[in-house]
């Protein structure tokens, strides 16, 4: 039966805990899968979505896979954690574009092991590595349009973690989508420098609220909790990323379907089936609602029609968006 080996930030503990899995027998037809979840599995965001996909594929594939997972790892410790996984698994997956640089380095050292990055881009890849692009910027354009449709103040905000091209491009397209609906809308964009910093995310959201923002979007992991705290205190609302909060949390008026879990399942299923291929693979809106889309809680038929039309225009090339 598949099982998780979850390890924390201390690299010594990571290595020690990993060693506990070494004696577990693995059937010849069982795929050993190592997964690096740099954040928390319960962040209500990217990491949780990836974890949900991992648990789903465990249920569907059963004894065909054995999973070893490392979570809550800092950037400085990422390469060593991935090396630990590569030493004992046939497929190693990094959840999040922040794992791509370290994953590339480790993949070069283990040419017989398959590697996949969920949220990868067109950066350097190696012959034994695949990069699955969720196309966040593409989806953010649609989310921005939705935010503009529901904003009562004409001011919306976006908070990103690391100020890197995919996250910056996502913020840019969020603003472009909003302005396609309301050219006069004000879009406030901030980067905290850390996907998991709750205090900085709260501070950035409160600053946006002080300028009139009533709808917030994000690319955050645990940092989302800070945005939630600010929105709850000030009575504003969030369009979430990755996980469905409609009907369970009044702060949320919608969520974007970024498909992190779907891509995690895809990587493992392809490897088990023997159809896994290296290289860059874009997903996004073209791959359907499991991979990318938007769900607005209680949206009217008219709003759904407008958002579907915007998505179609992106797919048809009538609306050009940035990479990311």
Language model features: what each stretch is:
Residues 8-11, 21, 62:
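Low-complexity, intrinsically disordered short peptide segments enriched in small/polar/basic residues
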Residues 27-324:
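A residue-level marker of the well-folded mature domains of exported/periplasmic proteins
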Residues 19-26:
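C-terminal segment of classical bacterial N-terminal signal peptides
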Residues 2-14:
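Bacterial N-terminal signal peptides that target proteins for export
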Residues 1-2, 27:
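Initiator methionine at the very start of the polypeptide chain
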Residues 11-12, 18, 44:
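Sequence-pattern detector for short linear motifs
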Residues 6-7, 24, 92:
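Intrinsically disordered, low-complexity sequence elements enriched in Ser/Thr/Gly/Pro
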